[in-house]
């Protein structure tokens, strides 16, 4: 399971830049894993173990990017709601 070190109990993240920075490393790691899995398939594209590894890497990448997108959208909505309440 991925460890999002910025999202631990008692650790406040106050702005969107901090959220993006916290999610950058897991996203980069997932992207590298997908690229490495694709590179491993170049020699033996019909290897079931390598295909399963690629599928796992893509699923992990997808989950991390969905989490990132959801968090950024939530922060945007929160900030937009706060700004709309100002006169």
From Swiss-Prot:
According to its UniProt entry, one GO biological process term is: protein secretion by the type III secretion system
Provide the protein's localization: Secreted; Cell surface
How would you summarize its activity regulation?
The secretion and/or polymerization may be controlled by the type III secretion system regulator YopR.
Signal peptide range in chain numbering: none
Q: What induces it?
A: At 37 degrees Celsius in the absence of calcium.
Keyword Cytoplasm on this protein? Answer: no
What GO CC annotations are associated with the protein?
A: cell surface; extracellular region; type III protein secretion system complex
InterPro entries this protein is in? T3SS_needle-like, T3SS_needle-like_sf, T3SS_needle_YscF
Job of this protein? Component of the type III secretion system (T3SS), also called injectisome, which is used to inject bacterial effector proteins into eukaryotic host cells. YscF/SctF forms the external needle filament that protrudes from the bacterial surface. The needle is not sufficient by itself for the formation of a pore allowing translocation of the Yop effectors across the host cell membrane.
Q: From which organism does this entry originate? A: Yersinia enterocolitica
Gene3D superfamilies found in the cross-reference section:
1.20.58.90
> Does the keyword field hold Secreted?
yes
Q: Which family does it belong to?
A: Belongs to the SctF family.
What subunit structure does UniProt give?
Answer: The core secretion machinery of the T3SS is composed of approximately 20 different proteins, including cytoplasmic components, a base, an export apparatus and a needle. This subunit polymerizes and forms the helical needle filament. In Y.enterocolitica E40, the needles are composed of 139 (plus-minus 19) YscF/SctF subunits.
- What keywords are annotated for this sequence in UniProt? Plasmid, Protein transport, Secreted, Transport, Virulence
Q: Gene symbol?
A: sctF
What is a single Pfam family found in this protein's UniProt entry?
Answer: T3SS_needle_F
Q: What protein name does the entry list?
A: Type 3 secretion system needle filament protein
């Amino acid at each position: 399971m991925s460890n999002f070190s910025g999202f631990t109990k008692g650790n406040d993240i106050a702005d969107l830049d901090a959220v993006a920075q916290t999610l950058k490393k897991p996203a980069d790691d997932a992207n590298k894993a997908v690229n490495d899995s694709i590179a491993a398939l170049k020699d033996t594209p019909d290897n079931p173990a390598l295909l399963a590894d690629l599928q796992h890497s893509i699923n992990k990448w997808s989950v991390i990017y969905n989490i990132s997108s959801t968090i950024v959208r939530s922060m945007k909505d929160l900030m937009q709601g706060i700004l709309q309440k100002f006169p």
